[in-house]
Amino acid sequence: MFDRKTIAAFIIFAVMTMGGCGSSSSNFLSENDRMIQAMTLEEKVGQLFIIRPEHLNRTVSADYIHYHLTSWDTVLTDEMKDTLSKYPVGGFALFARNLDTHEQVKQFTADLGAACEIPPFMALDEEGGRVRRIGRKFSADVEQIGTMQSIGDTGDPQNAYNAAYTIGGYVKEYGFNLDFAPVADVNTNPDNIVIGDRAFGSDPELVSSMVSAYIDGLHAQGVMATLKHFPGHGDTTNDTHTGYSAVYKTWDEILQVELIPFVDNFDKTEMVMTAHITMPNVTSDDLPATLSHEIMTGKLRDELGYNGVLITDSMEMGAIIQNYPHTEVVIMAIEAGNDIVLLPYDYVASFNAVVDAVK
C-alpha cells in the first residue's frame, strides 16, 4: 500500500525539481528504491497524507480546528516541529488564512519544507476565478485570472495556457510546487452550485483541450498539476462540502462526457483528485466515489488504466465527516485505492490508525 504511492511521489517530485540533473531513469529508480527501503514505517505512513499546518498544533483539538478556529497558523513553531518529528507528512495544503504577507508566506513554506526529512508537496487551490488563495489575498500584487468558464468561452486553449503560466509563476515564487488544478469537470448541470464557472464549459472536447493547455502552463513554471474531481462533479446539484451529493448517470453515459477530459490527460497530470459524489447507477455499495473500491480501483485503475497518483478531495468535507468515523474513513479511502489522503479530520489519530492497521 505504501510502495506505489511513495515511488510515484518521489518520481513526480524529481521530474519537476531535478529534471536538469542528467541522471538516467534506471539510476534514479535504483536510488529511489534505496530511499524507500531506508524509510521507517512511520515515514512511509506519513507520505500518505497532505495536511493543513494547524494539524501540527496539538494545543487544540481536531473539533476546535474544524469548528471554532479563528487564528490560523502563519509561522512554524518549535511545538509544531516536534509534532512533525513524531508524525511526518507527505505535504501541506495552505489556505488564504495561512497567508499574511509576501515574505511571511515564503518563509512559512520554506520552514515547513526544511522541517521535513523527505521533501514535501507544498500545495494550494489556485485555479483562477473564484478559487484563488494567493490571488484573493494579494489581489493588488498578482495578476487576476478570470473564471475558467470565461476562458473556455474564448475557444482558444492558448488562453488556458497563459492563465496557468501566470498562476504557476506566482505560486512557485511563494514556495508552492503543487496546484490542485485544473478543474476537469464538464459543467453539464446549470443548477450546479459547486462547480459552475470553475469548469471550462459543457463541451467535453473543449474542456479536454483547455485542461491540457492549462497543465502545460503549470509545467512550464515547474509546478505540478492535479486533475479534479474524478469521476466528474459537473452534473451535481448539491455541494459535497456540506453534505451528500449524487450523480445518477450510468457508467456508459459518464464515459461519453464527464470522463473525456480526465482520460485524455492522464498521461500529463501528476495527480488525479477524487470526488465525494455517490453514483448509485454505477456502484453497488452507494459509497462516495472517494471510498469506493469499485470506482477508484475497478474503474479508474483497472478499466481506464490510470497508474499515477490518486489523491482524495478534502476529508474534512461534509459528505465525509457527517457520515463516517474520522479515522475509519481514512482506512477506507486507502483501501479503495487512494494514494494520498488530503486533510484528514484528525491527523495524529488518522496517522496512528494507519500504523496500527499495518502492524
Regions found by a protein language model. Name each.
Residues 78-95, 165-178:
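Catalytic domains of carbohydrate-active enzymes, especially glycoside hydrolases
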Residues 17-20:
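C-terminal motif of bacterial Sec signal peptides marking the signal peptidase cleavage site
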Residues 54-55, 124-132, 136-137, 177-187, ...:
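Short glycine-enriched loops at secondary-structure junctions
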Residues 31-58, 81, 85:
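Mature N-terminal segment immediately following signal peptide/propeptide cleavage
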Residues 35-40, 64-79, 98-120, 130-132, ...:
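Second-shell residues forming the walls of enzyme active-site clefts
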Residues 3-11:
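Sec-dependent signal peptide recognition
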Residues 22-24:
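Bacterial signal peptide processing site
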Residues 146-176, 181-215, 219:
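A substrate-binding/cap region within the structured catalytic cores of diverse enzymes
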